């Protein structure tokens, strides 16, 4: 499959360097390859963001300060799967979620949709050194589940993923990527400031979803039932 490097900044003699941040409840100078939760969005990996403020939100809990660990990584020669590029659709991202996150396909429609997406929109993402794509926390995963169950359209799902401006994840998957990562410092995220921001962002996304998106059907909207009935494939222009 295709790899895209357009989001990587060239610097220092033409090499591709990127600054990324990881939110955590502790300082992590040397992330461990192969360590982490298997049910994360893109499987086991080291989950980062290019947005330091977002890392601070990810690092805090309701009663504990967090840390935004800062790193530099040289991406020259690494295979980067950027799911935001035009080569891919929202269904490619959703299929990766279905392969990793626990999803209860309790209805016949959801079960059929899951099987169809896995057969037709699967990517060999495990071959990538780095994956760039949406982050699906609990709120956003529920939006994806609504699409699979036929409650919202493809257009509504695409719009919903931008609610709250949750941002993109920059996920290190391979040993090669881990070896390129250089710890350059950290900033403390105080629970008083950043947990409030975190809760506010999630609340805003949910409110906008139910107020603006979930009940705003448009004529011609594309639903999962149509995708299944017409056996739509990744090259269908309606998915772009």
PLM feature spans:
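Short, flexible loop/turn elements at secondary-structure junctions
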Residues: 25-26, 52, 75-77
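Extended catalytic/binding region for NAD+/ADP-ribose chemistry, centered on the ART fold
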Residues: 37-62
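A glycine-rich, hydrophobic loop/mini-helix early in the fold
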Residues: 70
């Amino acid at each position: 499959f295709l790899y895209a490097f357009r989001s990587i900044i060239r610097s220092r003699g033409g090499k591709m360097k990127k600054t990324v941040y990881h939110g955590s409840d502790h300082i992590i100078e040397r992330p461990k390859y192969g360590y982490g939760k298997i049910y994360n969005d893109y499987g086991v990996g080291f989950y980062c963001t290019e947005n330091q403020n977002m890392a601070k939100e990810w690092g805090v809990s309701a009663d504990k300060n967090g840390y935004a660990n800062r790193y530099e990584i040289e991406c020259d020669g690494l295979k980067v799967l950027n799911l935001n590029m035009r080569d891919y659709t929202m269904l490619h991202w959703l299929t990766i979620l279905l392969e990793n996150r626990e999803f209860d396909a309790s209805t016949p429609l959801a079960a059929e949709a899951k099987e169809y997406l896995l057969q037709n929109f699967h990517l060999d993402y495990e071959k990538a050194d780095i994956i760039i794509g949406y982050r699906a926390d609990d709120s956003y995963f529920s939006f994806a589940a609504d699409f699979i169950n036929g409650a919202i359209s493809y257009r509504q799902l695409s719009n919903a993923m931008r609610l709250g401006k949750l941002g993109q994840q920059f996920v290190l998957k391979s040993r090669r990527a881990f070896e390129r990562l250089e710890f350059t410092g950290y900033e403390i995220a105080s629970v008083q400031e950043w947990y409030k921001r975190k809760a506010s962002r999630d609340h805003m996304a949910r409110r906008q979803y139910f107020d603006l998106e979930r009940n705003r059907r448009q004529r011609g909207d594309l639903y999962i039932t149509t995708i299944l009935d017409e056996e739509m494939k990744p090259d269908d222009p309606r998915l772009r």
